[in-house]
């Protein structure tokens, strides 16, 4: 506690209290900012300041003098408090004006050109492929990512114990037995389209799919596919091959070509793998496996309510990430999902 000898004394008279108030008002007027004003207030209205000290000394006066002396103390303190509030309001107004001036934006001032963002390379390639099919007169179709097992497997001629149905290959939606999965391909979109549209059908189905793969240089559990489906009268493998050739030449250059090799898929018969030949960016050229294709299995057409004696169809599908990977000579698929700007800068960002 501060010793009473250290406390500034003020005469308990109108003249003495006015002098203390004058000193406080002078200190407030000299404050250049709110911090200095707060310091001046502590000096003149704090516990050890003259006017508060005078209030505490009222008890030492004779009773008949306390009322008048108390009135004088209150008048002095009220005068000082009023002046403090006025000065504080003025300093706050000046501070706010300074802040507004500092934050003012000159809309006529030329701006520096910054780096512009753009779409991810996977999105760019997906849209390029979609544009190719739209240019051929095809439609773009989409469907749910959480899919019924019926559309993902049963309607596409997968037998009940097919390995693709297991937990080792497919994400099943809880609870067990719900009959729902994260779609493993975009083929369910083809079945949904055949059930909901009139024939003929020519659709491309780009989209995200899910499989229980570990993320490594050539695999990712979440990736993108584009699948195509055509159902019409008189379609053959020749129409399929011509479509694949057009897609390859548009994506990889006029020198690109495709070949098909026999394979097996439940939803096509006959089925084939499709390879693409093109000149890469390093000056080399060669064949590389691209995707799967074939004529739509009659069982799939029947499940969609299509008469296989009157209509035929072909289908194909390939991975977007894989296409981007070998088209652009990318050694590691993980670069596509890790969001590293050093990867996206050459593809999805333009200055």
UniProtKB/Swiss-Prot annotation:
Binds 2 magnesium ions per tetramer. GO terms for biological process: phenylalanyl-tRNA aminoacylation. Its EC number is 6.1.1.20. It is an enzyme of class 6 (ligase). Pfam families: Phe_tRNA-synt_N, tRNA-synt_2d. Keywords: Aminoacyl-tRNA synthetase, ATP-binding, Cytoplasm, Ligase, Magnesium, Metal-binding, Nucleotide-binding, Protein biosynthesis. Residues 45-69 are annotated as: Disordered. It is found in: Cytoplasm. Tetramer of two alpha and two beta subunits. Belongs to the class-II aminoacyl-tRNA synthetase family. Phe-tRNA synthetase alpha subunit type 1 subfamily. HAMAP family: Phe_tRNA_synth_alpha1. This is Phenylalanine--tRNA ligase alpha subunit. It comes from Corynebacterium jeikeium (strain K411). The gene is pheS.
């Amino acid at each position: 506690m501060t010793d009473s000898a250290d406390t500034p004394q003020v005469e308990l008279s109108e003249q003495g209290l006015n002098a203390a108030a004058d000193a406080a008002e002078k200190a407030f007027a000299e404050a250049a900012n709110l911090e200095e004003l707060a310091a001046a207030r502590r000096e003149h209205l704090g516990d050890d300041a003259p006017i508060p000290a005078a209030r505490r000394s009222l008890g030492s006066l004779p009773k008949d003098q306390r009322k008048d002396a108390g009135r004088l103390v209150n008048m002095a303190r009220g005068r000082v408090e009023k002046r403090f509030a006025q000065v504080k309001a003025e300093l706050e107004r000046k501070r706010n004006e300074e802040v507004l001036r500092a934050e003012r934006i000159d809309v006529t001032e030329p701006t520096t050109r910054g780096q512009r963002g753009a779409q991810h390379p996977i999105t760019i390639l997906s849209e390029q492929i979609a544009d190719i099919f739209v240019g051929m007169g095809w439609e773009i179709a989409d469907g749910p990512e959480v899919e019924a097992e019926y559309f993902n497997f049963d309607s596409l001629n997968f037998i009940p114990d097919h390995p693709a149905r297991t937990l080792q290959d497919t994400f099943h939606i809880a609870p067990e037995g719900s009959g729902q999965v994260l779609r493993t391909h975009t083929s369910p979109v083809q079945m949904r389209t055949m059930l909901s549209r009139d024939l003929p059908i020519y659709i491309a189905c780009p989209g995200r799919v899910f499989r229980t793969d570990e993320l490594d240089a050539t695999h990712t559990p979440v990736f993108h596919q584009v699948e195509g489906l055509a159902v019409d009268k008189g379609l053959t493998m020749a129409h399929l091959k011509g479509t694949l050739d057009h897609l390859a030449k548009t994506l990889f250059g006029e020198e690109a070509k495709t070949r098909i090799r026999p394979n097996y898929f439940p939803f096509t018969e006959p089925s084939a793998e499709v390879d693409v030949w093109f000149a890469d960016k390093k000056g080399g050229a060669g064949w590389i496996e691209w995707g799967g294709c074939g004529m739509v299995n009659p069982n799939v057409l029947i499940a969609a309510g299509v008469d296989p004696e009157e209509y035929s169809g072909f289908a194909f599908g390939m991975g977007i990430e894989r296409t981007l990977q070998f088209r652009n000579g990318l050694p590691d698929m993980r670069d596509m999902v890790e969001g590293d700007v050093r990867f996206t800068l050459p593809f999805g960002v333009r200055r």
